[in-house]
Structure formats: structure tokens, C-alpha cells
Amino acid sequence: MEKLKEFERDLQPRQHLWYFEYYTGNNVGLFMKINRMIYSGQSDIQRIDIFENPDLGVVFSLDGITMTTEKDEFMYHEMLAHVPMFLHPNPKKVLIIGGGDGGTLREVLKHDSVEKAVLCEVDGLVIEAARKYLKQTSCGFDDPRTEIVIANGAEYVRKFKNEFDVIIIDSTDPTAGQGGHLFTEEFYQACYDALKEDGVFSAETEDPFYDIGWFKLAYKRISKVFPITKVYLGFMTTYPSGMWSYTFASKGIDPIKDFNPEKVKNFNKELKYYNEEVHVASFALPNFVKKELGLM
């Protein structure tokens, strides 16, 4: 494993060093100015880059794909975590697969009912880099309720039966690295088996515009396993299309019928994106999304 190292000087602004990310198909993309390179490393699994942008703050990238920026990461992490957390009647034990930056863990730990949160990350260097350079998202790593496991999530979850109240899949892009293992029907079945009878599940399922193939495939596979499967959407400004999809699933809990808005209204921790109105609205899908999912 490569040792973490810091870059000792800022890059000269006149050099105009830019970060380019190409979306699926390589015809559209995102570019960000690099003010300062903070860290760059290569694990056995993937390339890790962390740099500073004047507008977005610290940016975290894996294999050239943006994972988080300081300015907008709350949008993604709050929607991925709080939708399932507020739908479970009393979430005590939570499993997060992926999410090595720590943002989803941070949001899960805002719920006082949580007694244990297991973060299963496949790449130990991501955890090490996040702990050192991504202070905003990795703040829950040392919480006494946190257990960090370095393992392949698809293999790890198979060890459990009827164990977790909530399982959250915070995977990387399925087109590169290890992310594809977390988009299989076998994996979703293992998650189903690891959940308690009243357990709930959520997963990031890509954007429904540029990544329509993966989006549809994830929904199809999850709905084969879980009797209740619902897609919901949220803004995510530095992800492809600016609109991101998540999929909620459960053995019996409905994300609209069983949602109690009073729980959100009475929540005493800071939320910058998620609220009771956003929860309900996020499950209202545009016609083009409904059509792709065969819902109209």
C-alpha cells in the first residue's frame, strides 16, 4: 500500500491545471480548476486524487470519477442515508457498504437510536486518505459506535442473516473498479437476507440520464428481490446530469405510506438538504424516468 504523501507547494495559478471527468459515452463531461493538489496515490484497486478547487473546496476523485466535493456532498449523503433511516421504526444496527469518504456514516450517526454502524470499505487507502484529508466527511470514523471493516462488501454481507436494521449501498461507479460487484442480483439477495424482517435498504443507482442502462438494471434487479422497491431522486450538482437516483427497498415498509413527517420535524440535528417535504417529493418521478422503468 502506497504511503500517504502531501504536495509541498501550491501549483501556480497561471498554469491553469484542470481536472476532466468524462461521463458515460465520453461525449460529455465535467471540468474543474485545480488550485492545489493535496494528495495523489494508487492502491491495489484504484487511483485516488484529492485536490482543492476555488469554488467547490476539497474534491475527492477515484479513477477520474468525482466522489465528493466539500460544497455539495451533503446533497448526496443526506438523501442516501436519511430516507431509509427515517423510515425504519428504530434503527439500531446499520451496515454501510462503500462510502469510504465517511459522509454517509456521518449522517447515519446523527440518529441517536444507532448503537452500531459498520462501514465496509474495500480499499483501506481510501479510509486512510479520508481520515487525513477529508475532515468534513470522515468525522464519524472515531465515533465509538463505528466499526470500520476493510473487505469486499459483496462478500462481507453474505456472512449475515437477519442481522441489520438498515443497509445502505454507497458504491463507486459500476463501470470502473469494484463498483460493479454491488449491482448484481446476487448481491441484492444477500442484502435482503442480512436484513431483519422490518429492515430497510437504500442504494445509489446512478443518474437516470447519462447512465440510463445501469439505472434501469439496478432497479430491475432490486425489484426482483425486494417486494417493495421505489426509486427516488435528488439534486447532486457535481454528478452527471445534476440529478441523482437512489433506490429504496424493504420487506414491507412503504416509503410514502409508512413515512412519519413528524419524526423529521422533531429531528434536532442539522440537515442542509433533506426534510419532510423533500422526502415525499423525491419519490415523484418525471415521465421520462417512469417510462424507462416501465411504470407508465
Swiss-Prot record:
**Pathway assignment:** Amine and polyamine biosynthesis; spermidine biosynthesis; spermidine from putrescine: step 1/1
User: Which reactions does this protein catalyse?
Assistant: S-adenosyl 3-(methylsulfanyl)propylamine + putrescine = S-methyl-5'-thioadenosine + spermidine + H(+)
Q: Superkingdom, according to UniProt?
A: Bacteria
Q: Which residues bind S-methyl-5'-thioadenosine?
A: Q46, E121, N152, G153
GO BP term (any one)? spermidine biosynthetic process
Going by the UniProt record, its keywords in alphabetical order are: Cytoplasm, Polyamine biosynthesis, Spermidine biosynthesis, Transferase
Instruction: Locate the residues binding spermidine.
Output: H77, D101, D170, S171, T172, D173
Classify the main location: cytoplasm
Instruction: List the InterPro entries.
Output: PABS (IPR030374), PABS_CS (IPR030373), SAM-dependent_MTases_sf (IPR029063), Spermi_synthase (IPR001045), Spermidine_synt_N (IPR035246), Spermidine_synt_N_sf (IPR037163)
Q: Report the residue ranges that make up the PABS domain in this protein.
A: 16-251
Active-site residue list:
D170
EC numbers listed for it are: 2.5.1.16
Q: Where is it localised?
A: Cytoplasm
GO molecular function annotations of the record: spermidine synthase activity
One GO CC annotation, please? cytosol
Entry similarity comment: Belongs to the spermidine/spermine synthase family.
The record's note on quaternary structure and interaction partners says: Homodimer or homotetramer.
Role played? Catalyzes the irreversible transfer of a propylamine group from the amino donor S-adenosylmethioninamine (decarboxy-AdoMet) to putrescine (1,4-diaminobutane) to yield spermidine.
> What's the name of the protein?
Polyamine aminopropyltransferase
Gene transcribed to yield this protein: speE
